[in-house]
């Protein structure tokens, strides 16, 4: 695949080997990612902002935190503005999709993606790569929502509507409130949730990456 990829951010990402799935989660480099979008359909909607932060050996690296707005040509819907608070003026001053995606891919190289309800991040990042590069790799991902769902199901816990939302899962683990629907705040909140989930597992055992991948 690498030979057919032109130089640039995607090639840089692909040139770094994926992490061994047997490696212990405690020692692995991760990147917690969140997108705010104009809607839920990656074919017709757009990434509005991207927030991400690295996790190295179980420690959230706040110095690596990044939040970027994506420049859009069209107007945002009133519904999406109410949710994420990003206005047309904000996105008109943002960076091009190519710049934001390139920065993200370089940050993600050699790391495993972490996201909450990762389907959103995966589908929109895949679509962005298709638009920009004509192709997209498969991105290994740890989905904190799926980890929580499996944990509850194994204990025969009834899952109510809303139980798997990031805000409610953080409450379950005693984590503090945070500013929801801001891409960087959500990315940091997701990183903290993953740390809490790992912390409630048997720390005396190796926890291989494959156990966490969606």
Give residue ranges: language-model regions:
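Short, amphipathic alpha-helical segments that act as regulatory/interfacial helices
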Residues: 126, 191-198
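Acidic, divalent-metal-coordinating active-site segment for phosphoryl/phosphodiester hydrolysis
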Residues: 182-193
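Mixed-charge, glycine-rich, non-catalytic linkers/tails in nucleic-acid processing enzymes
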Residues: 201-214
